[in-house]
Amino acid sequence: MIDVDKIRQTIVCGLKDTLGVPVIRSNTPRALPKLPFCSYTIQSLLKNSEGTWQRIGNGIDRIPARQVWSITVNTEKYITCAKLALLAHDFFSKSGVIWLKDNGIVIEKVGEVTPRDTLITVDYEHRQGFDVQLGIMNTQEYSEDDVIESAEIDGQYIKDGGNINDE
C-alpha cells in the first residue's frame, strides 16, 4: 500500500518551504487562509504502472505506480500569482527533484501552468496552476504462507517458479 500521508507531508512541506505561503488541500471544510496560498488536489490516488509485482525480500512486494496532483496558487495580484505558480512549477521540475527522490517520489511529468480563475473569483482572486505526475512505489507485505508452490492445470503440474512437470 502506498503511504499517502508520507507523500502528502513531503510535498506539502517542500512547497511551503519553496513558496513561503500556506499549502492546503483543496475543497477543505476548514476556513481558507488569507491570500496568497497554494492548494492541491490528488486527482489520481493510485494507478499501477504497466508491469508486474516484484518480490524484493524482507516480506515486501512492490510495483511502480503513479499519482496525479493538481497544484493551484491563489493570490490577490496577477504578478504574485504568476511568480508563485512558476516557483511551484520549478520545485517539481528542477529545484525539488532530488529532495523528492530522496523521499521516494520521482517526478514523471509536470504540466503547463494555466489560469484557473473562475467567473466568481475573477474580480478579487487570481489562480494559476498545473498538474504533476508522480512516480511512486506501491508496496504490499506478504507471508511465505501466501505462496502457491504448485498448481495443476489441464493435467499438467506447474511448480518451482513455472516449470511444467508431468506427475
Describe each PLM feature range:
Residues 61-79, 86, 125-136:
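Oligomerization/assembly interface segments of phage tail-like spikes and tubes
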Residues 48, 79, 138-142:
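Residue-level signal for secondary-structure boundary sites
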Residues 37-39, 69, 105, 130:
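A broad, low-specificity signal marking well-ordered, structured residues that form hydrophobic/aromatic
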Residues 91-141:
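Acidic-leaning, charged glycine-interspersed low-complexity segments
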Residues 10, 17, 128-139, 144-147, ...:
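Positively charged, small/polar-rich N-terminal and surface patches that mediate targeting and assembly
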Residues 24, 41, 72, 108, ...:
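Residues in well-ordered beta-strands of folded domains
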Residues 1-59, 149-167:
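Small/polar-rich, solvent-exposed N-terminal microdomains that initiate assembly or binding
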Residues 84-92, 147-148:
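Short amphipathic alpha-helices in soluble, non-transmembrane regions
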